[in-house]
Amino acid sequence: MDYNKTINLPKTDFPMRAGLPKREPEMLKRWEDMDLYNELLKKNEGKPRFSLHDGPPFSNGSLHMGHALNKSLKDIIVRSYAMRGRYTPYIPGWDNHGMPIESAIIKEQKLNRKAMSVADFRTACHQYADKYIGIQMEGFKRIGVLGDWEHPYKTMDPGFEAEEVKVFGAMYKKGYIYKGLKPVYWCYHDETALAEAEIEYQDDPCTTVYVKFPMHDDLGKLSHLDKSKLSFVIWTTTIWTLPGNLAIALHPDESYAIVRNDDNGEMYIVAEALVEKVMAVGKVEHYTVVETHPGNFYENMLAQHPFLPKTSRLVLADYVTMDSGTGCVHTAPGFGADDYQTCRRYGMDMVVPVNDQGRHTDYAGKYEGMLVEESNPVILNDMKEAGSLFASEEIVHSYPHCWRCKKPIIFRATPQWFCSVDSFKDEACAACNDVRWVPGWGIDRMKSMIRERADWCISRQRRWGLPIPVFYCADCGKPVCTDETIEAVSALFAEKGSNAWFEMDAADILPKGFACPHCGKSAGFTKEEDTLDGWFDSGSTHFAAMKKDQGFWPATMYLEGLDQYRGWFQSSLLTAVGAFGEGAPFKECVTHGWTVDGEGRAMHKSLGNGVDPADIFNENGADILRLWAASADYHADVRCSKAIFQQLSQNYLKFRNTCKFMLDNLVDFDPTHLTKAEDMPVLDRWLITKLNELIEKVEQSYNDYEFHIITHAVNDFCVTTLSSFYLDIVKDRLYCEAADSAERRSAQTALYLTLSTLAKLFAPILAFTCDEIWLAMPHTAEDDARNVVLNDMNKPFTAYALDAETMARWEHIIEVRTAVNGALEEARAAKVIGKSLEADVHLTVPEGDVFLADENPAALADLFIVSKVELTVGGELAVKVENAAGTKCPRCWKHSLTPNAEGLCPRCAEVVRHLPDLL
């Protein structure tokens, strides 16, 4: 007889093969049709809010792995809070203005920016930004990110621009914004100032020089020496800045030596601490220290410039160090922040002998018209010929490059608009104390950056940006920015967008009869031509998008990459504190690392080591990408490679197939008829107690944003607790007990509670798969069967929980089971048995082993998946395996000493007796 018909064979429509690349787009369509995002908001309407404010990606280029990591983490967090009873609006946004888009359209469309009208050029930029918003949006949706995709915020939208103008106006009114001539990062390839966040450092080769500046006027202090033989020796890595030298800085308290070259009689003034090093570099083998003086001894002396007809003043500065160079610091106020401040303190005029295009001006004499990098070898050769070069070396140093064009930049003084961060640094640092930083060291990093930063250069010499809303009086020439002008500009931008600034005259923007607040005249005004730094745009999103449009402030969370400590986190904090004095615009600040290849290297086209998210979607599925984001300790750099995704796919299959097994065995289960705890075997309650532990661990890990702990815990639960132990044991109950027996229904109850819990716990991470599981499983009337995310995560099932003593007993039993399994493997290898049901086990336990001594041998046989267990108390733990006695039951394969006429064991005979229609 075929007893297969009498067995509860597992069956479900849930497929073993995931087919995610094909299945996920179908699920996305279903989510869209049911308006899942808004349904989720309705579910939690009126409950406490969790608001993750989206840091806007730049609308330039297609989706990359950095985007994928960032958006996956955000969606995991938002979903996890939504499934724990929080109202979770998520409004995606984009950062649109800035040089990257200008550079891209000039290159792609071969546009001549200077030959086009400003309005036409800006329109082309707008269209380009819109194009990539669409491309990126589709990629983010493909990941499964839930959000208000119909109403994203964009920094180029008129409404946003109107509110950003108000942020500028508020900071200007407080005196935090000013225009000044001071050194800034300058990209002469793109002809614009740059913020610190727009700088990347690369190792570049360079020639470093030690240059002699002959003594010109010693103020009568060194008349006993031959002045014609005496020189200050400076050191620099930027030869091209030497035409801009106005001073030599010494430390006031350090000792400076006058060193005589015993071979030629020349004398050099260098820091005493660096004499040996400098003489070695200059290959001066025979020298004598003639005398020493503190740095302040030389103040206001004059040295002769080595190749231009001018002098250089000796000044004092505390920043001069003794760890490199000569202790005599080349000082060019047009090319350095410290240089600028020092020369300003001495009342010296600003000199900037390099123009916007990076070429020397006429101030540089014979070098006029040369690009700075072209002038380096020429100046070097001229100094050699003039005898002013003391020494030179070839080194590799870290040098700033433009983040967009990747070319070296210079530090150059130009008229720019600045935000005086010094004016509110203390308030900004204090605001950090009210923020939860993840990782915890974030607060120190942010405070350090704020304390050490210079004033923020917020102006750009670009066309595609928000115009700086400042006018200039034609009579007195002073800048004009008042409440009245800000209101007028904001209203104009709200109605017509910021293009109107370039298309309208100042008189048509300002209120009729407007008079200059400085001189009272109203003869005429001109408009500022510079645009705002893109970081000011994105730094204003907390007000322009979040507070104004979304109606809440501050955000619960900002979550971005590590680079945003000097980028969006900082610009948002500075505008919030500077404009409104309301503290940080976020309660929590979470950061993730960079995405790198499998070997930890940055991904570059030249290395061919990049990973495209689209390839992951098409080959593995978005759930595997989400699992990748969740499985990594994302606070460090996150590795990605095909091998990593293949391994993750294997882990995914373990989860999927474990859930499939449970679904298979729940096909006839009605969850309204759960087995009560008091009617449930201890093994089933043991599983639910372990499930309770998992629930608590996952809950805490979601709170801590430690998703890799969740993925590890769920994987371990599926592999170790379920597949390797519980599911293996209960197969006999599920398949061979009567379909509606108490024993089978109890196991199904445990499976149902477990599957429901796993689907909910893991739904924020495996959004597609857990929803697929949810759709395939049975539900109660309290469930929202439409989508798993519309349900709250399960809380521990305390009614089923075992006490600590019972759990300890079962941990011991599991240890013994491991020993039994080892003995079974040895017997199988020795050909004593085949399947474990072909074995009888003789188990000896110590007399004091109260946990095992009281166990029912029949229950132990089920636990060990053998036909029989004989238990002996007394002696060391020992396991003996023998061939099972009796007859093999053709239905359950257990061996029985009392089979019926058909060979069925008593249990199977009883089950089959109640199935006459199958016989």
Predicted segment positions?
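Residue patterns forming the tRNA-binding/recognition surfaces of aminoacyl-tRNA synthetases
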Residues: 2-13, 17-20, 26, 30-34, ...
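N-terminal catalytic cores of NTP/NDP-binding nucleotidyl/phosphoryl-transfer enzymes
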Residues: 42-103, 234-241, 315-342, 346, ...
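Secondary-structure capping and boundary motifs in well-ordered enzyme cores
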Residues: 44, 48-55, 65-69, 73, ...
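Acidic, turn-prone loop/beta-hairpin segments
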Residues: 95, 184, 188, 194-200, ...
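Short cysteine-rich clusters marking metal-coordination/redox-active sites
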Residues: 187, 402, 473, 516-519, ...
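Cys/His-coordinated zinc-binding microdomains
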Residues: 191, 461, 477, 520, ...
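Protease-associated
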Residues: 247, 254-328, 337, 341
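Alpha-helical recognition segments enriched in aromatics with Gly/Pro capping
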Residues: 313, 318, 346-358, 462-464, ...
